[in-house]
Amino acid sequence: MLGTLRNLYLNSFLYDKKISKPFISSLKYKSSTYLLSSLVKIQTKKINIDEFVFDAVWTNGNLSNKQFKKLNNFFWIFSLDLKSSSSSVQKIIENWIEINSKYTSKSWEFDTTSKRIISWLTNTKLTYDNSSEEYKNNFNFIIQKQTLHLLNQINNLKKY
């Protein structure tokens, strides 16, 4: 019963409004892959993103749960060649934001969301740099929103 009520709340307009409050106006983040080497397994074989088609990837209902998590946590960005088109990566993120800007239990699952934030912020050369102001605003907003969601989840764990 409590889980059902919590799930209703997490999918509500009130919860979306709660985690949609921006707390910083812009993102200034430059990362080093060395800092996260203990968390992330970086592949030596690099992939060029321009060799793939990602038009309907976020709406593909044929993915297994494992494939869905791998796709949505964005850790595959660590396998990309830095010579890949940043505009292609940014378009993929932009599409993800359009479809997943509101909480859903599957794409906003705690582990998946935390990995997605790590991936996006660690790979700013592809995910953020050389993008439009509109994209940066949307990116900053969704990073903050996901962070607030994670903080909310952590705070709720402490209560139980």
Please give the residue ranges for each predicted region.
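Extreme N-terminal leader/anchor segments
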Residues: 1-54
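Generic preference for well-ordered secondary structure
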Residues: 23-26, 42, 60-64, 100, ...
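Repeat-mediated protein-protein interaction surfaces in helical alpha-solenoids
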Residues: 53-61
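Aromatic-lined, polymer-binding surfaces characteristic
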Residues: 64-160
